[in-house]
Amino acid sequence: MDLSGVKKKSLLGVKENNKKSSTRAPSPTKRKDRSDEKSKDRSKDKGATKESSEKDRGRDKTRKRRSASSGSSSTRSRSSSTSSSGSSTSTGSSSGSSSSSASSRSGSSSTSRSSSSSSSSGSPSPSRRRHDNRRRSRSKSKPPKRDEKERKRRSPSPKPTKVHIGRLTRNVTKDHIMEIFSTYGKIKMIDMPVERMHPHLSKGYAYVEFENPDEAEKALKHMDGGQIDGQEITATAVLAPWPRPPPRRFSPPRRMLPPPPMWRRSPPRMRRRSRSPRRRSPVRRRSRSPGRRRHRSRSSSNSSR
């Protein structure tokens, strides 16, 4: 009996030791299974990272195409920076030891972004350059137009060829003026108005027109303040009249509308006034009604008497 009990105890102890050893050190087959599972997980992670990197590359390609179509350099630099950052993140997820290199790459990508943004801000796009060039060309083309207008306005007026002679005595005639002023140049015309009542007497002034403006200037210098028939005369230049614009064609007068009929001529105020006596009429009737009653009462009293 004692031997059987001892055998049972020894068997129980051996079983417990086997359990402890199994819990402490797993079997080599289990280790292989676990290593296979870990390798599968790693391969899955690598496949996922590869897919993400391929997606990022596809996105970068599409962005590059868009940037090439638009012709903007800033979008290209951003796509390159995003591709570098995607590659750095894939390397960081695959191995923990390359985390420092990923951080350095991300830092370099951020610096490249800042440099690309600064370059894009420094160098404007070709479309903006075209707009700026158009604005500059327009602004440059405006000043010559103003200069031309100012030159046209400042154009010198033609020199006068006609001279007005005033304060002449009534004894002076056209022949006298012809003799005096013909010494300065060829005279084109002499106009000497005469009084209506006395046609043999002049009005005291005359107009002498020369062929050249230089001759008219000579006559002005020598004869302004000179004497004819013992009296000082005045000589002034007559400016050429500005060309008047042609008279405007007046439109024919508009036909007057016929007057409205009599029943339409009355203004609305008269209508309002015409309504007011109608409103007052019942008041007058009320005021007359007591008088009528009095007359009736008097007539009734007379009849009773």
From Swiss-Prot:
Pro residues composition bias: residue spans: 242-262
SMART domains (alphabetical): RRM
RRM domain residues: 161-240
SUPFAM superfamilies per the UniProt record, alphabetical: RNA-binding domain, RBD
Effect of residue 205 to A: Abolishes exon-skipping
GO BP: DNA-templated transcription; mRNA splicing, via spliceosome; negative regulation of mRNA splicing, via spliceosome; nuclear-transcribed mRNA catabolic process, nonsense-mediated decay; positive regulation of apoptotic process; regulation of alternative mRNA splicing, via spliceosome; RNA splicing
UniProt feature, compositional bias: Basic residues: 1-10, 127-143, 151-167, 266-298
Comp. bias intervals (Basic and acidic residues): 33-59
Region annotation Necessary for interaction with the cleaved p110 isoform of CDC2L1: where it falls in the sequence: 1-220
Modified residues (Phosphothreonine): 161
Segments of skewed composition (Low complexity): 68-126
Modified residues (Phosphoserine): 53, 155, 157
Sequence segments annotated as region (Necessary for interactions with UPF2 and UPF3B and UPF2-dependent NMD): 69-121
Region described as Necessary for interaction with SRP54, nuclear localization and exon-skipping: 1-161
Domain remark in the UniProt entry: The RRM domain is required for the formation of the ASAP complex.
Cross-referenced PANTHER family: RIBONUCLEIC ACID BINDING PROTEIN S1 (PTHR15481), RNA-BINDING PROTEIN WITH SERINE-RICH DOMAIN 1 (PTHR15481:SF2)
Name this protein carries in UniProt: RNA-binding protein with serine-rich domain 1
